[in-house]
Amino acid sequence: MSKQETYIDYNYIERLNAVNLNRSYDEEIVFIMTVGGVVKVKKELLVSVSNYFKLITKNQSNEITVSFQYESFLDIIKYIETGIVTIDLDNVENIFSISCSKAIDFLKNSCIDFMSKHITDSTCVKIYKIGFSNGCFAVYNDAIAYIRKRFTKIETDILLSLSLFDLRIILKSGELDVSSEDDVLLFIIKWSRHKKSNRRKSFTLVTEVLRYNYLSIYGKYKLTKWLARFGKNNNVELNENELPRISYQHRFTNRRYTMVTPSSFSINMLGNVSVKNELSIINSIAENHNPYCGSVLMNDILYLIGGINKSLDPVSDITSVDTRSFIELHTPPLLHPRKCPGVAIFKNRIYVVGGIGYDGPLKTVESWSPGEQQWREEVPLLQPRFNPCIIGTDNDLYVVGGISEDDKTIEIYSYEENTWSIGNAMNYSHFGGCIAYHHGYIYMIGGLSFIDNIHVFTMVEKYNPHSNKWTVEKSLPFPRFNSSLCIIEDSIAIIGWIYY
């Protein structure tokens, strides 16, 4: 199969021909300021390919600044001018990132089609990372399924580049195709040696993904010797309740066997852990909910909303627990399955905004108030957004970022008018940042900001809702990413995730 494919947008070409027939001599030009150069494009063409550009050019001047490289954006301009794009393994990542962040649907779908056709042993990890970083479930789910199926065939050096987070998703699955559980152990040991920072993280993999009961006697011996090198043999808790993986379960079906006891190897097994305090109860309930969920505390009740299941599908499930009685409560499911939503309290209702559904980022918004039998459909966003920062003020709901890592845009929902509008963009992006409403101002704190193409995690901005202006405030003393935030007395407290 060719590693280069050309995609033609026939519907767009028809619109393009109509525009050319009606060409005027005073056509308006938009200047796109990229990293490394300036790209010129006709405004009429630019706004026809994406609602994002339509909104940006409507509310700003004819200069647009993007954080993408000049060469990468030339492929986008070629499509805008001709309706044709040629995709290969070298340019697919940049084209896909731009099309996702700027909502160019044809290019996005073309990249998805190209990547799904070209997942191989050498490209699977790259395609997985492209899909995940752009929030595209279809891409990274296909890549993960491929990696699990070909795990022992893919070159180890390629798999060693995966992070702890990536490996948790891949190795925990019962569909991981290995000849024995020893294969998993040997890979974890190799991964621990690949980088010094992997050593501590590898103990997490051992406790969370390794199916100890199905190691061979040699595998258990190997594990014990490896742990002993770091003085961990008595401090690692292993889960003995997992079933065998599908690829080797036939060897354990209808068979009585004697397992070597953990005490033989001086390893403590994770049994039925008794709940020792109230916080443990909440933690236990929370850990059983789906990852990538939204969370909010309302009237002393903790709500965990949406997320993904073990098959990595977005879900509509909600877990709610009374933090006073520590009793789990019933809450109706969402109308739309979603992971990575924005969640906030506004007008005594829980608002769930955007997120990622089965087909990618969502515009949908829904709300619910305790006592209601189902969620209520609300006016959708102007742009699909996932993992945005969201905060309510007296009469407005603010949704910040969520289109891409470098997104600086905000949308404002007016409760009185029941409409969304585009607000004044931030000075910097704050991907993975946190948000607060304090003394009449909105604060965007930390997260990933791009300054002269350098990654910065300490920026703080303050927004005045009355003047619709952002100002840059004093930076954080430590870089923060995906931190938590709370108001304590008269101060904003940032908790966790110092980023280095």
UniProtKB/Swiss-Prot annotation:
InterPro entries to which the protein is assigned, alphabetical: BACK, BTB/POZ_dom, Kelch-typ_b-propeller, Kelch_1, SKP1/BTB/POZ_sf
Top-level lineage group: Viruses
Kelch repeat locations: 301-348, 349-395, 397-440, 441-490
Domain BTB: 27-89
UniProt keyword list: Kelch repeat, Repeat
SMART domains: BACK, BTB, Kelch
PANTHER family found in the cross-reference section: KELCH PROTEIN, RING FINGER DOMAIN AND KELCH REPEAT-CONTAINING PROTEIN DDB_G0271372
Family: Belongs to the poxviruses Kelch family.
Protein name as catalogued: Protein C13
Organism field: Swinepox virus (strain Kasza)
